[in-house]
Amino acid sequence: YVVYVKNSPNRTQEPSAVLPNPFGLKNMLGNVMEYCSDWYAPDAYSKMQDGAVDPKGPETGTEHVVRGGQFSDDAADLRSAARGQTEHDAWLKTDPQDPKSIWWYSDIRSVGFRVVCEPPEGTVR
């Protein structure tokens, strides 16, 4: 169901390499970390009130959140709640564009993105 350190040849794998989860989705954990629009702050959770619904984190920042673990992680690190941060400047070092892109991370092959969609109106959440 996941691509991680014990079943990857130290690189990403095609979606066909894993089985779908009960929702029919693949690669929700492992393979690549997912780039999120939330800004990263190491203390973001400690500043939230208990019971917060869909917390957004800080309004500004310098690095974004990445989640879910990657192909070189141990199984214990592959969780939806696993949270790290981008390393923007380091990941752009060999970007050939001038000026540098704010989105294209040519040096990091272990980050993807999460597709988010709303369920149809009237369905159970």
Where do the language-model regions lie?
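Short, charged, amphipathic alpha-helices and their helix-cap/turn boundaries
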Residues: 1-9
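Short, small/polar residue-rich loop motifs at catalytic or cofactor-binding pockets
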Residues: 18-21
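Surface-exposed recognition segments
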Residues: 8-11, 28-125
